[in-house]
Amino acid sequence: MAAPPARARADYDYLIKLLLIGDSGVGKSCLLLRFSDGSFTTSFITTIGIDFKIRTIELDGKRIKLQIWDTAGQERFRTITTAYYRGAMGILLVYDVTDESSFNNIRNWIRNIEQHASDSVNKILVGNKADMDESKRAVPKSKGQALADEYGMKFFETSAKTNLNVEEVFFSIAKDIKQRLADTDARAEPQTIKINQSDQGAGTSQATQKSACCGT
């Protein structure tokens, strides 16, 4: 028997799948842990494949269940992560403000997204480790903003360590996705239900493959 549409569940109004994408070491797992559990650690080992966490938030009187997938950033895992673009409603592109190569690789990640993700997927650019001393900064905030503007994305600098803008990033992309889904509901309800059935199914199958390891 097919699973009910995501919005038919009693404990939430919307189920939103998010991906954290970016090079290894930029702090994706730290951002995920800070947002989902309110904690921070530097003792991660490298993520093997994909792991995810869930947090339910409230926006405009609606309960939004966020299913947030943490992807490995290494090149050799990119074939694994491409399968998880399917069904993703939002993608957080993360770089390390002290590592210029991780910033330059954002364009490669965007190309990867354009090849494998839905055309309507929401994207947001995140410059992490903004708590680091300015002498260690390799990517000026203005450069991050310029790249975000080029691709029509919102932009935040964050720190998982100090909790700078972590809540704001996830709430911002969730709000934009909720609005997009609500607009779709208003135009064609059957189409929206179909999208959510697919997303729910994707989340179920992927959950069985998640790794117990975490990192970056």
Curated annotation (Swiss-Prot):
It is a lipid-anchor. The keyword Lipoprotein applies. GO terms for biological process: protein transport. Induction: By ethylene. A motif (Effector region) lies at residues 44-52. A lipid is attached at residues 213-214 (S-geranylgeranyl cysteine). Residues 185-216 are annotated as: Disordered. GO terms for cellular component: Golgi membrane; plasma membrane. The keyword Zinc does not apply. Keywords: Cell membrane, Golgi apparatus, GTP-binding, Lipoprotein, Membrane, Nucleotide-binding, Prenylation, Protein transport, Transport. GO terms for molecular function: GTP binding; GTPase activity. Disulfide bonds: none annotated. It comes from the Eukaryota. It is found in: Golgi apparatus membrane; Cell membrane. Its main location: Golgi. GTP binds at residues 22-29, 70-74, 128-131, 159-160. Residues 193-216 have a biased composition (Polar residues). Belongs to the small GTPase superfamily. Rab family. Interacts with PI5K2. Involved in membrane trafficking from the Golgi to the plasma membrane. This is Ras-related protein RABE1a. It comes from Arabidopsis thaliana (Mouse-ear cress).
